[in-house]
Structure formats: C-alpha cells, structure tokens
C-alpha cells in the first residue's frame, strides 16, 4: 500500500506543478499578446502597514455602470476604446459573444452590488507613493477570452508611470 501512496503523491505533485506552469504560461501570453486598455481611476488611496505601500484601484467605469438586481454576478463587460486606448463600458453580457470589431471583452464579477473588472490594487516600493499619486489610468492587458492583467498605472498624458529604481 505504501508503494501506491508514494506513486499517488508523485502523480498529484506533477499535476499540480503542471497546472501552475500552465497558468504562468497563460498569463505570460496575455502580457505578450493582449490588447492594452486604459481604465480611468476614481479616487481611492488607503494604505496598509501590514502589506507595505499600495494603491487601491477603483475604476470610474465600474462605478458609473452600477449593476441592477437582474445583472448576473459574473459575466463580460464589453468596452469600446478610443484612439488613446481609454475604455468605456458599452454593455454587460453573460456570454463572450457577440462582440463587434471595435469592442473589447473583460470578465467582471459583482460583489455587494459593486462591479469588479480586474486587479483592484497596485503595490509599489516603499517611498514611491508620490510618483504614483499622478496616476489617472490603470493599464490592463486583455486577451480574447476576457482575462485581464494589470500592467501598470498611466498619467494624464497616457504614459506609463515607472520607478527610477
């Protein structure tokens, strides 16, 4: 019996590592091939002593498109982007399709009647808070399945804010 339990443990460990590596690969593909969309930030900036410096992100689009009682708790936010890649939600739907040529899909979830579109916090090095105070947009890379990754914060001129360190 011990022989089978060791084999079972090894097989499960290999599956776990395979799943982890696949997840990392998918995120790297989204960073490499995903479409950039900028979402305007609404003001929020609490600090956490336990976690270092961070900025809690509240997207203006999520605040202005408050869901009603009939909206599904999970689905897809359809965004239209302008020439500067700034996204605007045009509708919420529960399926990936239909999407027009000039539209982009981001997965959403609703918790306590609040719409979440992706990364809701941005961590930065201690002492860099003044650099990120000028952030106006959160930049997300989005794949064709609606998965999104926060790639950085952008200023009012649509430039990525980067630390000098």
Regions found by a protein language model. Name each.
Residues 38-40, 78, 141:
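Generic structural detector for well-ordered beta-strands
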